[in-house]
Structures are given as C-alpha cells and as structure tokens.
Design a protein with these regions (language model features):
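Alpha-helical transmembrane segments of integral membrane proteins
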Residues: 2-3, 95, 99-132, 148, ...
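N-terminal signal-anchor/signal peptide hydrophobic helix marking the start
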Residues: 6-12
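Hydrophobic alpha-helical transmembrane segments of membrane transport/permease proteins
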Residues: 16-67, 163-183
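Hydrophobic alpha-helical transmembrane segments of multi-pass integral membrane proteins
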Residues: 17-22, 65, 107-111, 154-155, ...
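Juxtamembrane/transmembrane-helix interface segments of polytopic membrane transporters
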Residues: 19, 23-27, 32, 152, ...
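Membrane-water interface segments at the C-terminal ends of transmembrane alpha-helices
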Residues: 22-29, 59, 74, 138-169, ...
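Short hydrophobic, aromatic-rich alpha-helical segments embedded in or entering the lipid bilayer
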Residues: 46-80, 270-282
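An internal, D/E-rich "acidic patch" concept
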Residues: 60-118
Length: 327
C-alpha cells in the first residue's frame, strides 16, 4: 500500500511540472502581448517605448523562458503561485474565490449526468431495438452533435429571457451584498448552467453504458439465467448492473476533464464567475501565472478522478484491490 501511494505521489508531482511547463511554453509562443492586453489598446498606443519596456520588465516579460519557469516552479514549491496580472491579486486568492462556484457547478453536473446517463443507458440496452431505445439513442446523437455554447444560449433564451423563470447570468443577484446572498439565491443562479453542463455530458455515458448492457445480455451466462426462468428485470438487476458498474465508474471518473472543459464555455455564456471564466480572461490577457494555476487545479482534479476510480475499483471488485496490493 505504501508503494502504491508513493508511486501516485511521484506521478502527481511529475504531472504538475509537465502541465506548468506546457502552459509556460504555450503562453510564451502566444501572439498576445501581455502589456498591451492589460493596459488597453488606447493607453498602449499613447505609451512611450521606455514605458512599455518598463512595464514588460516589471511583469517579467524580459526574463528568459527557462529562468521564468524555474522561478515560478521554485515559488510554487513554497506555496506561492504568483500574482495575477489581470486581477492584481495573488493567484491563490483568485482561484480560491472562484473555485467554490466552479466546484458546485461541475459537481452537480457530474453527478446528474452520471446518474441520468447510467439509468438511460441501462434502460436503452435492456430494451434494445424498441421504441425507448430509438428515442434515447436519437436524443444522444442529437446532443453529441450540439455545441455546448449553442445549447446554453438556447436554454438561456427560453428559460431566462422568454419565460423569466431564472436569472440571465451571474452567480448571485445583482446589487446584493455577499452577506445578504442566501443559499436559495445561489442555487437559483446555478440551475441553468448546471442544466446545460449536465445535458451535454449525458450522451457519451448513455451510449457507452448501452453497449456494455447489450454485450452482457448477449453473454452465455445470461442465456443460461434466462433458460432457468429468470425474468428480464431479474437479469438486469442481478447480472447487468454488476458487470456494467466498473466500466461506468471508469467513464464517469474520466469525464471530469470533459466537465471542466465544458464549464469554460458554460461560464462564458451565463457570465458565471468561476475558474473557466477566469481561464479565458487569463488566456486573453497573457496572464501566465493565473493560467498556470488554473491548469494545475484542473490537472489535479483529473488526477484525483483517476485515483478515485482506482479506489472504487477495489470497493466494487476485490480482485482489483488484491492486484493493486501485490503491485
């Protein structure tokens, strides 16, 4: 067990270094000028070359790439993620302020899409070729070909603009202080973004689960169970669910990365102040410190999802736990 966790800790550290290096390399080759992006076009045009060079030096733009990365990595080891150029605040504070909104959004969407996708996949697979199966598959194919931002705009126009049931954006009511915001207010603003992110994430889970159910129903032991007189419901409950659970756990934990990517678009559409919106702001402004910090958080979430899948494997299938212990 000690070797197991030590191996994962080493992998996690190497992953963080690799993600940070890739982010620094991409931002360094970006055509966006951080000075121009942060001071504004009008101020940049009227600024002297000496002032531009002074700002570039102040923000570290004149420091060689490897030196900047080494300084950032060294500070990160001491718990300092740097200072955001766009928000003029420590990166850790910016991320902490927005992480709660993003985690609530992604957590709800992850749970809803996982449960709904698993149930629909099992039902469609158990009723293969029937009307329910055709409707579910058509629904999934339609969603799989629908852009997230377009679906978000459609939901926003119907439920917020036309019907007026929900607010058009943000995470709290406009003009209300943070101390006066209730849990009901925050939940009311969270419904539409979470609905959009959940709906777009259902398709892959449904189709994958359906195929696994079909494979199980065509297996020899299911034929034998039916020959003994077991009903369709008994076959699904006692044979399908047990064998479909492990692949479903794998897919759902791997879906964390897609959830985070989808949240970037959803937060932009609904003006929801989360990590996705901050990542877009950092990318357009050349804010390498904030962008690297958000990339590290997202990589940690994906790594945690894979680790969670391994742990759940051991819970669902003791044979996996034994093999991991021997490794």
């Amino acid at each position: 067990m000690t070797k197991y966790f030590a191996r994962h800790i080493v992998r996690f550290v190497l992953l963080m270094l690799a993600v940070g290096l890739v982010v620094f390399a991409l931002v360094s080759t970006s055509p966006i000028d951080p000075v121009q992006a942060n001071v504004g076009q009008a101020a940049y045009v009227n600024m002297s070359e000496a002032k531009r060079a002074q700002l570039a030096s102040y923000w570290g733009g004149d420091v060689p790439f490897w030196e900047r990365f080494a300084n950032w990595a060294g500070a990160l080891l001491h718990g300092d993620m740097g200072t955001s150029l766009r928000f003029n605040a420590p990166v850790s504070e910016v991320i902490a302020h927005r992480a709660a909104n993003s985690l609530a959004l992604m957590g709800i969407a992850w749970l809803v899409s996982g449960v709904l996708g698993f149930v629909l996949g099992v039902v469609a697979g158990a009723r293969r070729g029937g009307a329910v199966d055709r409707v579910v598959r058509g629904y999934c194919f339609l969603l799989a070909s629908t852009p997230t931002f377009w679906l978000g705009l459609l939901i926003l126009m119907i439920f917020a603009v036309q019907l007026g049931w929900f607010p058009i954006g943000f995470s709290v009511p406009i003009g209300v202080s943070a101390a006066d915001v209730t849990l009901a207010d925050a939940a009311h603003h969270l419904v539409l973004p979470a609905l959009t992110l959940s709906v777009t994430g259902v398709a892959n889970i449904v189709l994958h689960t359906r195929e696994k159910v079909v494979d199980v129903l065509e297996s020899d032991y299911v034929r034998f169970a039916r020959a003994r007189g077991e009903s369709d419901l008994s076959v699904v409950l006692h044979h399908c669910l047990r064998n479909v659970a492990l692949p479903a756990v794998t897919l759902q934990c791997a879906f964390i990365s897609e959830i985070f990517g989808g949240s970037v678009l959803v937060e932009q559409v609904f003006s929801y102040p989360g990590l996705g919106q901050a990542a877009v702001t950092a990318g357009l402004g050349g804010d390498v410190a904030l962008l690297a910090g958000i990339a590290l958080v997202s990589a940690a979430l994906v790594f945690g999802g894979n680790l969670l899948a391994n742990i759940l494997y051991g819970v669902l299938d003791p044979r996996m736990r034994v093999s991991e212990g021997r490794a």
